[in-house]
Every structure is written in C-alpha cells, then in structure tokens.
Amino acid sequence: VQFYIDGAKSGKGEDMKSAFHKDATIFGYIGEDLFAGPIQKLFDWNDKNGPATELKTEITDIDIVGTIATVRLESDNWTGHKFTDFFTLLKVDGTWKIMNKVFYLHT
C-alpha cells in the first residue's frame, strides 16, 4: 500500500504500479459516474491529476487471514479531494499485491 501512497504523492502512475497485481481492478463513483475497470485507469488518472504533495494518509484497518488481507486507507487532500479506499490483497509468490481497490470520494 505504501507504493500506492508514494505514487499518489509523486503524481506518477508508474510509481504505484508495483503495489498492484497486473490483473487488479478499480471501482468507485466520481460524482454520478462509475469509475470502473482495469487498474490502468487509476494509473492514467494519477498521471493526469499530477502530484499530491500535501496528501495526508492513514491506514485505519488491516485484517489478515493467511494469504488474504483487507486494508482501509483514508486519504485527505489528494489535490483537494478526500477519499476512503478499501483494498483487497493477496500474497502472490511471497509478496502482497493489491487485487482490487474500491473507493469513496467524499463531497
């Protein structure tokens, strides 16, 4: 999850890629529009959005069972926006990878 945060701060999708499995997905709403699909959509959005140098994050929950886990991340001031993310992770070849990200954009 730290690679994800680092990529958000740098504004470079490439910096967050290693946090995710290559087949990861993303789902959430931006306004009335469903933002859904392959995780590449997040990387592309992050590249367009730019650096979030003032981003503040807090992991508020972690639950691990064997080779699966969930993480809740609160992000404040991602270029002026506040997000709540839920990640599902899987340990793949000994490394934790984010398999899915669902998010809520606070208004």
List the predicted regions and their residue ranges:
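Beta-strand-connecting loop/turn residues
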Residues: 22, 67, 94-95
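Short beta-strand edge/turn micro-motifs at domain boundaries
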Residues: 82-107
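Surface-exposed, charged secondary-structure patches
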Residues: 25-30, 36-82
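Short, well-ordered alpha-helical segments enriched in acidic and aromatic residues
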Residues: 10-23
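Short beta-strand segments enriched in hydrophobic/aromatic residues
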Residues: 20, 75-77, 102
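Hydrophobic residues in alpha-helical segments
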Residues: 8-11, 46
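Solvent-exposed, amphipathic alpha-helical segments
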Residues: 3-7
